[in-house]
């Protein structure tokens, strides 16, 4: 996702130093609303899987590091979800092509929203499969989600850069925006009363002869039974059903492909994963205008998604889903100016996707007389050691575990969903979400359903790996007994060159108001720990020991540029405001 001036590598070594020329639609809206971007988060290369290691590695679970923080095959927004769960930020913004937003939200006890077509513009976000791609806000509560959507769910004035808004092959019914998203919470506790909800048997350990086998652990079945009781206590009727939206889509006996969409031209699946991706990546790079990465044809395809040979998880992944990255570069070289709208088959594909959702979801719901579909977000969680443990890899790559439930069908056909915490798995201390889904345009009803369930349960809990710290609280204060005074300027804060001697760190600097430091309060934090600063008029100094963190060497990929460094934050408070500086110091310096 582009944030002007920051790198936007999409987790790929092929684009390490790619710098965004402007804000994405999402970043633009959030910045205008006063939000502060804390940073970009981890994703696998090109967002094309879940827990493969990208340029900066992968996120690890703040609930239980023995388990993955997202599904292995589709959970690319794992960094966004993990940082939000751990309260690094108030909320996160992910994206999803299969289950890349829903999956890490479930493994991190977060609310996830995947909207109907064109509710949140994806402009400025690296595309993967634009027919599937959707922006996924991730929050700790439904109320937080409503606040975020109040900012993001608006029309993009540059809609020609938004795939579904720009296409001319089928009319997408607009989703009417409520006057106020926060007002959707009003009386939402009763929103499930009198509603009929369908739960697909395949996702709760039942039998659906039309569906592919789906793994569901006893822990998840137990959580579902409790969730069902809660839904019924809220006044809903729950019926067990089939789920043709998924089972028909995944019937590869007809298409021979990973999906079966009636109306696709025979070779469309190859073009959707070939020319369409290549041309969109090419367009993205050209529009960004970084001279070091002018277009896709100049990229190194072999470095887009590198991983070791004989990589254990690859033994159990669907080979038909692997992308030919050097082949995409070659397609861009041979493009000869062809537009994505000139790719043969696209005019049939888009109406076919909309028609299949209407038939297999919306008409099916109408025939059953149900108001929504509800199901556990996943059948189990994968173990973190699957790169070294064959049994862990086999388990993590089963249907029901490798993706969020619903797999690619939900995204390919633009099904809106809202997920919220269902509870925690016994013995694993890992969360699992409950997902609400419905037809196009039913988004706001789903948000109310999720809030009613959340209010009735309150099952989310804080992650134990990142507990509350005294420094987590943001105290609004200046110098003792004083507020910001009119006509006063913030302190002038200066840091000198730090010195490291073994495990001892020496810092010094100055802070003052017009040369006088008497009225300035200095706070120094070394790796999050408060450290006492010695004062001498406007000069200050710190001498402290630190514990050097040496990260484990990953099997492949990298890790954050700040990992293994000493991080220092210095804050100066005066009568005219606050000044702060941050240092990231290498122990070898």
Spans of model-derived segments:
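Short glycine/serine-rich loop/turn segments
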Residues: 1-133, 166, 200-202, 206-210, ...
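Short helix-loop capping/hinge segments that flank enzyme active sites or metal/cofactor-binding pockets
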Residues: 1-13, 191-209, 258-359, 376, ...
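Stable alpha-helical elements in mature extracytoplasmic
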Residues: 22-26, 76-79, 144, 148, ...
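Structural helix-boundary/capping segments
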Residues: 28, 32, 86-206, 213, ...
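Acidic carboxylate-rich catalytic motifs and surrounding loops in phosphoryl-/glycosyl-chemistry enzymes
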Residues: 41-42, 237-249, 421-423
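Charged, often glycine-rich, active-site loop that binds/positions anionic groups
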Residues: 50-57, 248-275, 387
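A glycine-rich phosphate-binding loop feature that marks nucleotide/adenosyl-phosphate handling sites
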Residues: 165-170, 244-251, 371, 377-380, ...
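An extended, acidic, His-containing surface patch that forms the Zn2+-binding/catalytic region
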Residues: 336-412
């Amino acid at each position: 996702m582009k944030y002007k001036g920051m790198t936007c590598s999409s987790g790929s070594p092929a684009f390490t130093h790619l710098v965004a020329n402007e804000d994405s639609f999402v970043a633009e809206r959030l910045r205008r609303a006063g939000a502060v971007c804390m940073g970009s988060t981890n994703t696998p290369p090109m967002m094309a899987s879940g827990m493969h290691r990208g340029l900066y590695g992968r996120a690890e679970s703040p609930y239980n590091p023995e388990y993955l923080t997202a599904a292995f095959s589709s959970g690319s927004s794992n960094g966004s979800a993990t940082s939000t769960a751990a309260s690094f930020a108030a909320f996160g913004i992910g994206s999803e092509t299969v289950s890349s937003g829903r999956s890490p939200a479930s493994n991190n006890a977060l609310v996830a929203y995947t909207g109907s077509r064109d509710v949140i513009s994806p402009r400025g976000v690296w595309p993967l499969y634009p027919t599937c791609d959707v922006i996924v806000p991730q929050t700790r509560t439904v109320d937080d989600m409503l606040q975020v959507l109040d900012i993001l769910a608006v029309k993009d004035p540059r809609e020609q850069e938004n795939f579904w808004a720009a296409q001319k092959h089928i009319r997408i019914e607009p989703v009417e925006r409520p006057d106020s998203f926060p007002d959707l919470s009003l009386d939402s506790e009763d929103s499930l009363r009198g509603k009929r909800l369908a739960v697909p048997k395949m996702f709760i350990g039942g039998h659906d002869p039309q569906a592919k086998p789906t793994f569901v652990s006893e822990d998840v079945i137990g959580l579902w039974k409790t969730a069902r009781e809660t839904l019924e206590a809220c006044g809903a009727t729950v019926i067990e059903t089939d789920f043709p939206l998924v089972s028909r889509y995944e019937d590869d006996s007809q298409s021979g492909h990973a999906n079966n969409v009636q109306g696709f031209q025979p070779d469309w699946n190859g073009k959707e994963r070939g020319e369409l991706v290549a041309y969109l990546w090419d367009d993205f790079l050209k529009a960004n205008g970084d001279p070091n990465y002018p277009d896709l044809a100049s990229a190194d395809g072999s470095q887009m998604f590198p991983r070791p040979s004989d990589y254990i998880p690859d033994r159990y992944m669907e080979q038909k889903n692997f992308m030919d990255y050097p082949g995409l570069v070659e397609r861009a070289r041979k493009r000869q100016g062809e537009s994505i709208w000139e790719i043969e088959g696209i005019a049939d594909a888009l109406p076919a996707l909309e028609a299949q959702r209407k038939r297999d979801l919306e008409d099916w719901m109408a025939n059953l007389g149900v108001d929504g579909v509800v199901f556990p977000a996943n059948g189990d969680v994968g173990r973190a050691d699957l790169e070294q443990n064959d049994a862990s890899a086999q388990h993590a790559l089963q249907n029901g575990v490798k993706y969020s439930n619903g797999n690619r069908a939900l995204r390919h056909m633009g099904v809106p969903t809202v997920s919220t915490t269902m509870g925690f798995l016994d013995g694993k201390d890992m969360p699992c979400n409950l997902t609400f889904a419905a037809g196009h345009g039913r988004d706001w009803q789903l948000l109310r359903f999720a809030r009613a369930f959340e209010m009735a349960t309150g099952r989310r809990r804080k992650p134990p790996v990142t507990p509350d710290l005294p420094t987590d609280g943001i105290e609004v204060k200046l110098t003792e007994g004083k507020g910001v005074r009119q006509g006063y300027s913030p302190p002038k804060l200066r840091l000198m060159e730090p010195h490291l001697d073994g495990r001892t760190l020496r810092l010094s600097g100055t802070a003052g108001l017009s040369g006088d430091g008497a009225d300035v309060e200095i706070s120094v934090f070394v790796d999050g720990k408060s450290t006492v600063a010695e004062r001498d008029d406007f000069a200050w100094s710190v001498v402290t020991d630190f514990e050097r963190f040496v990260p484990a060497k990953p099997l492949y990929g990298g890790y954050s540029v700040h990992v293994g460094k000493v991080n220092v934050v210095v804050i100066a408070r005066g009568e005219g405001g606050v000044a702060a500086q941050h240092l990231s110091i290498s122990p070898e310096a």
